[in-house]
Amino acid sequence: MRAVVQRVSCASLTVEGHSGAQIGPGLTVLLAIAPGDGSRDIDWMVRKLLGLRIFEDDSGKMNASVVDIRGALLIVSQFTLYGDTSRGNRPGFSASAPYETAHEIYNQFVDRLRSSSPLVVQTGVFGRDMQVSLTNDGPVTMILDTP
């Protein structure tokens, strides 16, 4: 499982031309599922996202989590994070889980995230064309890969 995590002051998305989810301060998470990802990966990523201290505390240090600031999360599926361009210029996506498997793991991930925290968790629509708008705060961007 791979996530590109961005600290945002706001984010929103449009799904096939229609307004979709939106959040205020928090995290936008672009999430890709790999073959073999399962419950252990979901648990690790949920713990990491909720505990990641990339927000400023009262002294201005990056020492607060999204939970500490009572932020929100926008989760967007993005299989292209596993794109392989090592052979030519057109990316291959064989490192991404098949659609049905990825969809199931993605839904489990979102459910686990929602049940693990009182924070607002918004999502895109899995497998659909989306336009994501965000204001990256900092900018702060992290790339997380499950072990």
Curated annotation (Swiss-Prot):
Protein family according to the UniProt entry: Belongs to the DTD family.
Quaternary structure and interacting proteins, as annotated: Homodimer.
Role noted for this protein: An aminoacyl-tRNA editing enzyme that deacylates mischarged D-aminoacyl-tRNAs. Also deacylates mischarged glycyl-tRNA(Ala), protecting cells against glycine mischarging by AlaRS. Acts via tRNA-based rather than protein-based catalysis; rejects L-amino acids rather than detecting D-amino acids in the active site. By recycling D-aminoacyl-tRNA to D-amino acids and free tRNA molecules, this enzyme counteracts the toxicity associated with the formation of D-aminoacyl-tRNA entities in vivo and helps enforce protein L-homochirality.
Superkingdom as given in the UniProt entry: Bacteria
One Pfam family from the record: Tyr_Deacylase
UniProt domain comment: A Gly-cisPro motif from one monomer fits into the active site of the other monomer to allow specific chiral rejection of L-amino acids.
Catalytic activity: glycyl-tRNA(Ala) + H2O = tRNA(Ala) + glycine + H(+); a D-aminoacyl-tRNA + H2O = a tRNA + a D-alpha-amino acid + H(+)
GO cellular component labels: cytoplasm
Enzyme class: hydrolase
UniProt-listed InterPro entries: Daa-tRNA_deacyls_DTD, DTD-like_sf
Descriptive protein name: D-aminoacyl-tRNA deacylase
Coiled-coil zones: none
